């Protein structure tokens, strides 16, 4: 089954690939605001998000300002995943929007395991493409809506990724508000 394409949100991996990553990764926890990946760098970890949200941004090389591309929620990759198949050498920074738990995974080991199963190999090779589509859809929304529309869309998409069942409450008769399970920092919302 192809991954769900949602603007601003990195695609989630299949359940079978998630089990593989759980078997070969080691857990790490980060606090809100922690920078967990910067490129170019000497070392970069491939990470699988178990809980929380990670902001993924390109850096403007002239001003060192981030351009929000997407967010990785539970079930998505972050960190040095671009080097699995894409080597564009664009400077990037990933930081935690909320308290986050990730699994740090050895890239070479993951690729060797994926070579044993054509479905996993296809999933990993297509991950960068689907991520690019999500990023570009988010950039389109950045330029097509008002600030209020963009913020509302971002919060709804985050709610959809974190708690899909809560989305049903939005369309229930008589419900005037739905509590968000997270609170993005002002800097991320401002971008």
Feature roles, as predicted:
Residues 160-191:
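Phosphate-/nucleic-acid-contacting segments
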Residues 109-150:
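A small-molecule sensor/coupling module
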């Amino acid at each position: 089954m192809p991954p769900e394409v949602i603007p601003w949100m990195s695609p989630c991996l299949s359940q079978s690939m998630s089990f593989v990553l759980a078997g070969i990764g080691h857990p790490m926890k980060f606090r809100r605001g922690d920078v967990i990946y910067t490129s170019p760098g000497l070392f970069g970890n491939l990470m699988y998000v178990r809980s929380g949200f990670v902001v993924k941004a390109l850096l403007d090389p002239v001003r060192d300002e981030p351009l929000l591309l997407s967010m990785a929620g539970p079930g998505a990759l972050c960190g040095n995943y671009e080097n699995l198949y894409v080597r564009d050498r664009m400077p990037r920074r990933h930081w935690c929007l909320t308290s986050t738990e990730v699994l740090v995974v050895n890239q070479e080991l993951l690729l060797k395991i994926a070579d044993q199963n054509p479905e996993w190999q296809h999933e990993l090779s297509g991950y960068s493409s689907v991520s690019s589509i999500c990023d570009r859809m988010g950039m389109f929304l950045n330029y097509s809506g008002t600030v209020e529309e963009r913020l509302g869309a971002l919060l709804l998409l985050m709610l959809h990724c974190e708690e899909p069942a809560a989305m049903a409450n939005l369309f229930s008769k008589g419900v005037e508000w739905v509590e968000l399970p997270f609170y993005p920092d002002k800097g991320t919302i401002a971008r």
